UniProtKB/Swiss-Prot annotation:
It comes from Homo sapiens. Belongs to the AB hydrolase superfamily. Lipase family. This is Pancreatic triacylglycerol lipase. The gene is PNLIP. The lineage of its organism: Eukaryota, Metazoa, Chordata, Craniata, Vertebrata. PANTHER family: LIPASE (PTHR11610), PANCREATIC TRIACYLGLYCEROL LIPASE (PTHR11610:SF147). Its EC number is 3.1.1.3. The keyword Disulfide bond applies. It is found in: Secreted. Plays an important role in fat metabolism. It preferentially splits the esters of long-chain fatty acids at positions 1 and 3, producing mainly 2-monoacylglycerol and free fatty acids, and shows considerably higher activity against insoluble emulsified substrates than against soluble ones.
């Protein structure tokens, strides 16, 4: 996969200036589609027949086996497509295919939370070629999706505002093309790590941009430059809301060795894909998990990821934080501006959802050198222990830290404190936490107190005060 992304950028053939197709209109190789710095080769997309865009419909009635549908009244009427439901198209990227497990898995998670028409768009006929050619073929894919959306509107009175197009990699730009052709009337487009090569820095006409739908949200997971870092995704903001989980460049869990990747539980193919492009693929895995974790991917507005990791962007502002992924459209300020940036951390494996807390500990007892940890207990669950501070522990001093729990503990009922000495201390000092304040990302605070002190490695339970 890696050589195809890089070397195929250098391959291509000189084509004619324009080609036209009855249903989809004309396609040119003039600027900005070709002949610009980011895409110097003059290449036309392949024909609709060669790209062979297919629409694979899953619904709540057929969650496991798709029905292939077309922009045809009898095809739609003879399927499980329901006009009183939202329709979510999912478009894969380079070398991928519409029958790949991840697309169906998105649909299956959707069926857990809503009744929906879930259409996986297969264009493997145009994706399994050199990258430069595939980057042109997405124009055909976008045109086919736009034609399908317009057909639903004309034949069934189905509003484009009820359409959501989700695209990964090159599929994100295909979604943008569909949106451009429908004049921005599509309700929502979600770009899952939109492809960088041939798109970063190009005019809006070529790539995904906020004007392509009423609402455009983007997840960036592989934003390092393609040269020399082989980052496949864009770092450029291209939506109303742009999320940069873990900074948007290196995703946790993506540095496993090749053997552990290939013998992954997902199988040899999925494991090999993960090794070749793990960061790039994380975007659709985050989206899949977000569907069943409606509050587990809060994105914080922040100047940069470095500022975020310095604990300077918590809690959420008065307008709240958007949720990265499926529920981003619930954010009240989603279209207040374009290029709004948000940062968050995720887990290193599914379930990727995390819940961020700020914990402030006021110490009591003796002055010692060591480190302190706190665990949270709530009405929804309990967290593991997280380190709050390491260094000199002084009575009446307060130390704060933020951490991302893999459990949403809900309303807190108690906290537990423990400390460890960094050196052997024969005096057996005792340290306690006179007060611990826990703050959630929405600014809700819980206060806990204890008059006790404990020796190292002994748990101290604090109750509400």
């Amino acid at each position: 996969m890696l050589p195809l992304w890089t070397l195929s950028l250098l391959l291509g053939a000189v084509a004619g200036k324009e080609v036209c197709y009855e249903r989809l209109g004309c396609f040119s190789d003039d600027s900005p589609w070709s002949g610009i710095t980011e895409r110097p080769l003059h290449i036309l997309p392949w024909s609709p027949k060669d790209v062979n865009t297919r629409f694979l419909l899953y619904t709540n009635e057929n969650p496991n086996n798709f029905q292939e549908v077309a922009a045809d009244s009898s095809s739609i009427s003879g399927s499980n497509f329901k006009t009183n439901r939202k329709t979510r198209f999912i478009i894969h990227g380079f070398i991928d295919k519409g029958e790949e497990n991840w697309l169906a898995n998105v649909c299956k998670n959707l069926f857990k939370v809503e009744s929906v028409n879930c259409i996986c768009v297969d264009w493997k006929g145009g994706s399994r070629t050199g990258y430069t050619q595939a980057s042109q073929n997405i124009r055909i894919v976008g045109a086919e999706v736009a034609y399908f959306v317009e057909f639903l509107q004309s034949a069934f009175g189905y509003s484009p505002s009820n359409v959501h197009v989700i695209g990964h990699s090159l599929g994100a730009h295909a979604a943008g093309e569909a949106g451009r052709r429908t004049n921005g009337t599509i309700g929502r487009i979600t770009g899952l790590d939109p492809a960088e090569p041939c798109f970063q820095g190009t005019p809006e006409l070529v790539r995904l941009d906020p004007s392509d739908a009423k609402f455009v949200d983007v997840i960036h997971t592989d934003g390092a430059p393609i040269v020399p870092n082989l980052g496949f995704g864009m770092s450029q903001v291209v939506g109303h809301l742009d999320f940069f989980p873990n900074g948007g460049v290196e995703m946790p869990g993506c540095k496993k060795n090749i053997l552990s990747q290939i013998v992954d539980i997902d199988g040899i193919w999925e494991g090999t894909r993960d090794f070749a492009a793990c960061n790039h693929l994380r975007s659709y895995k985050y989206y899949t998990d977000s569907i069943v974790n409606p509050d587990g991917f809060a994105g914080f507005p922040c100047a940069s990821y470095n500022v975020f990791t310095a604990n300077k962007c918590f809690p959420c502002p008065s307008g709240g934080c958007p949720q990265m992924g499926h529920y981003a459209d619930r954010y009240p300020g989603k279209t207040n501006d374009v290029g709004q940036k948000f940062y968050l951390d995720t887990g290193d494996a599914s379930n990727f959802a995390r819940w961020r807390y700020k914990v402030s500990v006021t110490l009591s007892g003796k002055k010692v050198t060591g480190h302190i940890l706190v665990s949270l207990f709530g009405n929804k669950g309990n967290s593991k222990q997280y380190e709050i501070f390491k260094g000199t522990l002084k009575p009446d001093s307060t130390h704060s830290n933020e951490f991302d729990s893999d459990v949403d503990v809900g309303d807190l009922q108690m906290v537990k404190f423990i400390w460890y000495n960094n050196v052997i201390n024969p005096t057996l000092p005792r340290v306690g936490a006179s007060k611990i304040i826990v703050e959630t990302n929405v600014g809700k605070q819980f206060n806990f107190c204890s008059p006790e002190t404990v020796r190292e490695e002994v748990l101290l339970t604090l109750t509400p005060c």
